[in-house]
Amino acid sequence: MEIREIIGQLTLEEKAALVGGADAWNTAKVDRLGIPSIRVSDGPHGLRKTLDDASLGIEDTVKAVCFPSGAGLAATWNRDALKKLGGILGRECRAEGVDIILGPAVNIKRSPLCGRNFEYFSEDPYLAGQLGSAYVQGVQSEGVGVSLKHFAANNQEKRRMTVSAVIDERTLREIYLSAFEEIVKSAKPDTLMCSYNKINGTYSSENGWLLNEVLRNEWGFDGLVMSDWGAVCDRPKGVEAGLDLEMPTSSGLSAQKVVDAVIDGKLDEKYLDIAVEHVLKLVDKYTGFTNATGVAEKEPAVFDRVADHKDARRIAREAMVLLKNEGVLPLNKEQKILFVGEFAKKPRIQGGGSSHINCTRIISAYEASARHTKVDYAKGFSAFEDKIDDELAKEAIQKAKEADVVVIFAGLPDVFESEGYDRKHMRMPQCQNRVIRGITAVQPNTVVVLHNGSPVSMPWADDVNAILEAYLGGEASGEAVVDLLFGVANPSGKLAETFPNTLKDTPCYNNFPGNRLTVEYREGLFVGYRYYEKVGAEVLFPFGHGLSYTTFTYDSIKVISDNKKAKVKFKIKNAGNVAGSEIAQVYVSKLDSKVYRAVKELKGFEKVSLKPGEEKEIEIELDERAFSYYSPAAGKWLTEPGKYVIHVGASSADIRLREEITIDCEDQEVKRFSPEELPSYYTGSPACVSSEEFERLLGEELPATDKEPDEPVTIHDTLEDAKRTKWGKRLYGPVYSLISGRKVMGNHVDNDWGFSEIPFHSILNMSQGRLKPDTVDAVINLLNDIDVADNIRFLGNRGMTVTGNALGALGEKILTYKNERQVKEMNDNNSGMDKFVNTLENAGEKLGEIGRDVIDRLEKSDLMKKANEAGLKIGEKIDELHFSEKLDGAVSRAAQKAEDAGLKDKIDALGGKLGDAGESIMKKLEENGVQEKLKEAGNQIEEGLKKAASGFEEKIKGKNE
């Protein structure tokens, strides 16, 4: 049966259901017509399949091989390695019954502070596109689909679900869409995932220009577009704009909205049919349910975790970058070597959030080093917090004096970078910097191995002899680090991002993470090395930088240009005495350009392996896009006629060969800005663009950056937004406790900061039916000071009472100081007391009711009101200081220290002895009749309480009368 024929047999309700998930990971099915579901799963550097379909959490996932995260994979600059990795992941997916893996993530690294940079490839769109394409080809070669993400301009975690990226079209096309375009055209991914954020005021999930005009009409994408989890705001608008599938399930909420929109004439059913067709085509590709295409017979997938771990180790070696080496590496196993830092024994191998993998095995660098030699160890500092421990530091420095060489394992703790929030600074923990400085003061041979997902500042860089950037290297990172330290393998990775000296040096320093409503991309095209070269800024380590244990020479450049294309040939020789791999990079620059441009841009690269003394000729082809820029006025890519320079080098700052060529073509530009109109982009600093200049570039006025203080809270606002209202400031804590405490979304967002920035509509949609629309409406009404008493009663009827439920506590607090008129009336009235002293069956119930009556009276008094207000202020302060997180961390650390010291076993043994002693004591008490005496005393106390309660009741009644 043809898919369009099937669509004709579907009811409107079935169509609406098919364009939404069935649960967290599966598409919907229609048994009546034999339409099955397919399964998707998180990635992208390992399979993260949940064992529980209802869970969005990191726990309870299948064991899988954890490869280096995106930052490290990009440092390989190796298309073949990415393709191989994709193939491995594809086989693992097939073995586990997964049809689509959610990756790769190719968002551009606009700022080193983005909390999710560890998952992204590069600051350069060409490199990201090339590596992403190889990854996609590898996965899909195994009969498994990918979901290319996050489309588009999702370059920060702060307010990622609501912020609008204000960005000019040329920058959007050249920097932020370019990698997606390359992958769509060259690798043809089965699906693409839209991002949470808005672009110039429109949610990506509702952006018809982005999803239809650009993606499908211009690029020729014929796959399925799915939402990021919870990224849907207005489902009918999304259907019309080209969003085919909403994930995860909204438990029928979105489906009903789509049905209503079609019936009301607000959504043409043809758009729904298009979305359904895209869903069914994808399902058919992986199930063959129509019997029209069938599914090619596949060999049973082999999930060989041992073999895959070995590949993870090989890829991790290539993913690490030797930033500095003054002859101390590789290590000699005869040396007296000291490892310092907890990461040596407990490596940080991956980032936090939806990409977190349940690893098959982890071998630390300390364990792996035992295969080479005996290594001494000093903890030096904690790897999981920034707390200086003088005793640990003193021990490490003393041991460093006695060693021949010291290797310090440092980097960023988990809490410093994760999905859901951005970093606040580029600093490493001060406890680590202090120990590094202390050791370099007494030990001339010091190596630093870094475990981090994004650039860090290194105030000690000049004082150490070697720096190895290990990134987040996956489960085999410890072995890979040791392989490189001891020369078993030769470092070959190179940076896919610039390491600036300081945060203030970065191009978007003044515009990251932006304002409440918007983030302005005022730096335009000048991201990463494009900016640093534009302004002539010194950097710590340049884009493309990476050292080897050998040296390479470049020679004999020859460029053959043909119309708007060119072929670049040159030779590379291994001039050292060990085998190694070099990454040759080709950059293009335009001389005397009439449009503003970067000094040069990466347009080609090749990784080549050479034996000692071996020489190879490299050939790299440059297509028309290598010489083009995007013209918003012309609505297309244009090539400027004139002279260009081809640069060949070992990094963006280490250019070895140059050749000038001329391209003869027609100048097709319709309208270009002059240097007078955009001085910062032509001759000044793009980091200091005025509002007026940015508006000229945009062609329109800048949108509002914040809401007015008196604007009401809506379902599209966040908990953080609610704080701007009169009552929201006071109720933020209780409302936060209500929603986060009920865990309506599982653990998909792993931190409180991220949760507070999720809009109410996403919380509702992702609750999988555990929150109802009218429940959320009631909360919003409370925040807006509307129908307070009615909403509290309504929420109470939903079972959200004071007994053990956060919302009940919220309602109780609201009643004490909300609607002052009602409170005053109740105080004046003094009525309703008798309802608490009705017929009671026993003295205990009477006492309980009277106690609640007293509390009610207190709540109506100024005393309780002030106490509640003070309590809320204290609660807010605790929230601001993240006291609970710190307390949790302290408890965890105490537990870990107890475990390390063997206290658990000692306590268990002591507990056993106490238990034995307790039994003996109880036996003695029984023999002496003590238990009976205690029981009798208890009865007497109970009788006394009954009498007291009765007397208390009489006093209350008398006072009321």
Sequence positions of predicted segments:
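A general structural signal for short secondary-structure boundary/capping elements
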Residues: F381-E385, P513-T518, E614, E666-Q668, ...
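Terminal connector regions
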Residues: E624-K671
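Polar-face residues of amphipathic alpha-helices and helix-prone low-complexity segments
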Residues: M826-E961
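Low-complexity, Pro/Ser/Thr- and charge-rich linker/hinge segments at domain boundaries
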Residues: D664-G684
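Extended hydrophobic/Leu-rich segments
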Residues: G524, I560, F694, L698, ...
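Glycoside hydrolase catalytic-domain context in secreted enzymes
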Residues: M1-R625, Y644-H647, S652, G811, ...
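N-terminal hydrophobic targeting/anchoring segments and the immediately downstream early-domain regions
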Residues: M1-A75, D80-G90, R94-E96, L102, ...
